[in-house]
């Protein structure tokens, strides 16, 4: 189905599932993901300016998540790119990868960054 889109060799990383209670209780998932991504890019000497779009995947709402994608992009160093948030319960990461691939395949994007993060072990608790 996709002939132009691919994930380059060494162009990916994954972190272990985190327990958000205890030492990580006050961490913000988007900030943690963006800081980790920035280190990932720096270790490979890759410039975040190469990306033209950022797809943020996140299911559990947190403060600032409404504008989470451009915020995360700015934190990794891609300050002028747009983005979107995808929240698709139990399928968020797969949907992000698919949307990134389709965007490249159709020419909508040249080089899209898919960043998925969450606080799943804490469970959703939203107070209005």
Each language-model region and where it sits:
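Conserved "HGTGT" condensation-loop signature of ketosynthase/thiolase-family condensing enzymes
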Residues: 1-81, 117-128
